[in-house]
C-alpha cells in the first residue's frame, strides 16, 4: 500500500479523519474533519513518527535538526527522530520550545539540541492560523538558523481571507518549503477507491471547487 494511503487509512480507522458535515472555526461547513488530538497512544505516536520520517526521506531535504513547536510538535519531533534512527539509521537531534521563558535551572525558551546556525526542519500537525509556526520561525531566526522546510500532516489547500491558504501564505512570505503528508486531493482519491465512502465524493469536490486554491 502507498504510504500516503496507509496514513489516510490509519487516520480513518482511528477516527482522526471523519467524513460528514462539520462546522470549522472559520465558520465554513466542511465535508471532512481531521483531529490529530485523538492520536494519543504509544502505537499512534510510533506510526506518526514513521510517516513523518518517510516524508522527510522522500523529500531529500538537507537538514541538521528537527524542531517541534510547543505543544503538539514536541512528541512529533521526538517520534520522528526515533523513526529516522530505527528505520533509516539516521541519528538526528531534535529541539523544541517552551511557551514560558525560564530564568532558573535549564534557562531559556529552547530544550534539546542547539539550533544555532543549523538547518532546521519544523514539524507540526496541521497549520490553521499559523500562530505556532510564526512563533517557531522567530525563535529559529533569532538563533541565526535557516529553515530547511516545514512538514505538516494535512494541507486543506483552502483559500483564506487573503485568498490564499495559510500554508501558501507562508510559502509566499519567504519561499518556505512546506510539505504535507496528505492533502484534500489525496483524500478525494482515497474516497474514490472506497465503495463505502463514495457517497461523500460530491460534497468533497464541491467544497474543493468553492474553497480550494
Swiss-Prot record:
Q: Which residues bind orotate?
A: 33-34, 128, 156
**Pathway membership:** Pyrimidine metabolism; UMP biosynthesis via de novo pathway; UMP from orotate: step 1/2
Q: Name one GO molecular function term.
A: magnesium ion binding
Keywords carried by this UniProt record: Glycosyltransferase, Magnesium, Pyrimidine biosynthesis, Transferase
GO CC, sorted alphabetically, is: cytoplasm
The Swiss-Prot or TrEMBL record lists the needed cofactor(s) as: Mg(2+)
Residues engaged in binding 5-phospho-alpha-D-ribose 1-diphosphate: 25, 71-72, 98-99, 102, 104, 124-132
Subunit notes for this chain?
Homodimer.
Q: What does this protein do?
A: Catalyzes the transfer of a ribosyl phosphate group from 5-phosphoribose 1-diphosphate to orotate, leading to the formation of orotidine monophosphate (OMP).
What is stated as this protein's family in its record?
Answer: Belongs to the purine/pyrimidine phosphoribosyltransferase family. PyrE subfamily.
Could you identify this protein by its name?
Orotate phosphoribosyltransferase
**Organism per entry:** Buchnera aphidicola subsp. Acyrthosiphon pisum (strain APS)
Q: What is the lineage of its organism?
A: Bacteria, Pseudomonadati, Pseudomonadota, Gammaproteobacteria, Enterobacterales
Instruction: Give the gene symbol.
Output: pyrE
Amino acid at each position: 500500500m502507498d504510504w500516503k494511503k496507509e496514513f489516510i487509512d490509519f487516520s480513518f480507522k482511528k477516527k482522526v479523519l471523519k467524513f460528514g458535515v462539520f462546522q470549522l472555526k472559520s465558520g465554513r461547513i466542511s465535508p471532512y474533519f481531521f483531529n490529530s488530538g485523538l492520536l494519543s497512544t504509544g502505537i499512534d505516536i510510533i506510526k506518526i513518527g514513521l510517516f513523518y520520517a518517510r516524508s522527510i526521506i522522500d523529500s531529500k531535504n538537507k537538514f541538521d535538526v528537527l524542531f517541534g513547536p510547543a505543544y503538539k510538535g514536541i512528541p512529533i519531533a521526538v517520534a520522528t527522530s526515533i523513526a529516522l534512527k530505527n528505520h533509516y539509521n539516521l541519528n538526528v537531534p531534535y529541539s523544541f520550545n517552551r511557551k514560558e521563558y525560564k530564568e532558573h535551572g535549564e534557562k531559556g525558551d529552547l530544550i534539546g539540541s542547539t539550533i544555532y546556525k543549523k538547518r532546521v526542519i519544523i514539524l507540526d500537525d496541521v497549520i490553521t492560523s499559523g500562530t505556532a509556526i510564526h512563533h517557531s520561525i522567530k525563535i529559529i531566526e533569532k538563533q541565526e538558523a535557516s529553515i530547511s522546510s516545514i512538514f505538516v500532516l494535512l494541507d486543506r489547500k483552502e483559500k483564506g481571507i487573503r485568498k490564499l491558504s495559510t500554508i501558501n501564505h507562508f510559502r509566499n512570505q519567504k519561499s518556505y518549503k512546506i510539505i504535507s503528508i496528505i492533502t484534500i486531493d489525496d483524500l478525494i482519491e482515497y474516497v474514490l477507491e472506497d465503495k463505502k465512502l463514495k457517497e461523500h465524493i460530491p460534497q468533497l469536490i464541491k467544497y474543493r471547487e468553492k474553497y480550494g486554491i
